[in-house]
UniProtKB/Swiss-Prot annotation:
The gene is pepA. Presumably involved in the processing and regular turnover of intracellular proteins. Catalyzes the removal of unsubstituted N-terminal amino acids from various peptides. HAMAP family: Cytosol_peptidase_M17. The lineage of its organism: Bacteria, Pseudomonadati, Pseudomonadota, Alphaproteobacteria, Hyphomicrobiales. This is Probable cytosol aminopeptidase. GO terms for molecular function: manganese ion binding; metalloaminopeptidase activity. Binds 2 manganese ions per subunit. It is found in: Cytoplasm. It is an enzyme of class 3 (hydrolase). Keywords: Aminopeptidase, Cytoplasm, Hydrolase, Manganese, Metal-binding, Protease. Its main location: cytoplasm.
Amino acid sequence: MSDTVKVGFVPLSTAPRGILVAFCDESLRLGAATDKALGGAAELIQRAAAAARFKGKDGAVLDLLAPQGIKIQRLLVIGTGKSGDHKEKDFLKYGGTLAGKLNAGTEPVMVMAELPSGPMTPDQASSLAAGIRLRAYRFDRYKTKKKDEEAAVSAAISLAVADVAAAKKAFAPRSHVTDGVILARDLVNEPPNVLYPEEFAKRASALRKLGVTVEILDVPAMKKLGMGALLGVGQGSARPSRTVVMRYNGGKKGDQPVAFIGKGVCFDTGGISIKPAGSMEDMKGDMGGAACVVGLMHALAARKAKANVIGAIGLVENMPDGNAQRPGDIVTSMSGQTIEIINTDAEGRLVLADVLWYVATKFKPKFMIDLATLTGAIMVALGTEHAGLFANNDDLAEKLLKAGQETGEKVWRMPLGPEYDKLIDSQFADMKNTGGRHGGSITAAQFLQRFVSDTPWAHLDIAGTAMGAPKSEVNQSWGSGYGVRLLDRLVWDCYEARS
């Protein structure tokens, strides 16, 4: 897992050194402990703010050389906007903002976890710390020469808090979730010659150290199960396909598990229906759903979530070859349903079809959610701000929408219905793997729905959010790790919020 900045907690009364980070609202007021740490220099700071036209707007930053006579070299003041009720995602953002202003160096950094109204709560301070870690992430392990501006923050960062023990306790689970996001980012960012199905499965097996049971299904095992849809996708690759099933039991013995399923196309050329050359290199990220599931399982197991959870990922390469799947082929899925292949570049749904059926029938989960960089059509519809949400269960959909609002990993519900489902009927088989030009993300979801039986189910099309999305306060990486925080919050809301 990629290294990121080290964050710790110290008492609010600690004397600052090096770089000091403070917070103010639109009145430009500082907290009492911050003002004391600055030796009563608030008036001087207000004059500097006026000269810089800094008004304390939410996320704005005032960057100053420290006033003379104070034992710090630099002062960063971050605006929090109007005083009022700030959400967890706001403090995550503030942490990312301040980390973005810190250069690589050895100067100690102290962050005054204090608002003008008083000290931040342990939850607020821990969200701030998580935001710092997420923003500081870099994936540069293959660079032999690094520019100064590309270097990660190297100094340790101390958050000055009112209650150190409470802040550490609140941060522990958030730190594990952050580790899960970082793991997911690492997997998405890896080059495809390094991260192929067998290697991906090997990395997922490292979760055993956290008490996760990991089972790896090889090609003979999948053939025995009848996973013809998944195996058809990978038959043109020299790299054999894999399905990885991860089980974490943190809930009550005998309770139904919940399940998360990820599309893991480690590289997608499109197969015989080959993609254009432009930006094909981005298809190393077509396993963003599987990366999220592995990162999520890490987060849940490490923080000891109180739920029984299944994570399952189908891992393939979609390559053109003399043995590759052809348009016109008909394959038989594990469910027994037959599928006519119209376009070999609509492969992710074939992978998911068998894994969804396997999980639904073997584990009978309370609900299951799949994640996939499934369609370009969802990016046409929603851009890169929201993942597409499709569901056969309104309660599950509402819980996902709520978790998205709380974490900032937003989803937008899209329609399903028989009018769309009939578009994937085939003349020669039970169904075909594409439904035509229009409503492409919807017909892809309708295809998946045919493999979930009566299980409450949601599908997240993360093609616009998992990779190459616009950079944000908490993510400067090509691979975003989208979905780990969203689904961790869902598990928390469903199983732990009242415990």
